[in-house]
Amino acid sequence: MGRRPARCYRQIKNKPYPKSRFCRGVPDPKIRIYDVGMKKKGVDEFPFCVHLVSWEKENVSSEALEAARIACNKYMTKFAGKDAFHLRVRVHPFHVLRINKMLSCAGADRLQTGMRGAFGKPQGVCARVAIGQVLLSVRCKDNNSHNAQEALRRAKFKFPGRQKIIVSRKWGFTKINRADYPRLKSENRILPDGVNAKLLGCHGRLANRKPGRAFIDAVA
């Protein structure tokens, strides 16, 4: 018996049902890799960022997430180069889908019990997605911006419902506005932290102030 189509589980009707000690025997999600490309490139390398945003409240299966990741990665690798981008899948499939198996062969009426004890067995997993939630994000250089948008347009066909491609106003995957980033960096208020960056402020205890630095680490 094949896998039940994901359209049967598209609407969010019930509460979150994650894998736990009460919900055992859950099959592994099809998507295992969430970061693709040059994921170790510093925050200054890729200033441009574009998002694929869900415009519906729905369940997205792990198979759809994997198909979209492959489609986006394949296009970017071919037209931009494997060293020219960083793709990140922003949703994780934690919600378990159940199926109440019915026998459809001859003589099945003596074996199955219909809707008696209809709480099903785990069949797969999906991600619960809200309106305005980011599904995929790509950061790259400005000269590959059109390739990133086309890659997300192709990945959009792997998802149900409506999605929008939105060019971010932020610098890469950070929360800092792109217009403000060069100025803050020249003032030494940006502390690179992998693919992200910390913004140093001047609030905090004087004991945390370091010599020769006007700003205090926001974490301190």
Curated annotation (Swiss-Prot):
Record keyword Ribonucleoprotein present: yes
Keywords per UniProt: Ribonucleoprotein, Ribosomal protein
InterPro entries (alphabetical): Ribosomal_uL16 (IPR047873), Ribosomal_uL16_CS_euk_arc (IPR018255), Ribosomal_uL16_dom (IPR016180), Ribosomal_uL16_euk_arch (IPR001197), Ribosomal_uL16_sf (IPR036920)
GO molecular function, one term: structural constituent of ribosome
GO cellular component, one term: ribosome
GO BP annotation list: translation
SUPFAM superfamilies per UniProt: Ribosomal protein L16p/L10e (SSF54686)
CDD domains: Ribosomal_L16_L10e
Assembly behavior: Component of the small ribosomal subunit. Mature ribosomes consist of a small (40S) and a large (60S) subunit. The 40S subunit contains about 33 different proteins and 1 molecule of RNA (18S). The 60S subunit contains about 49 different proteins and 3 molecules of RNA (25S, 5.8S and 5S).
Homology family: Belongs to the universal ribosomal protein uL16 family.
NCBIfam families: PRK04199.1-4, uL16_euk_arch
Protein name, per record: Large ribosomal subunit protein uL16
Gene designation: RPL10
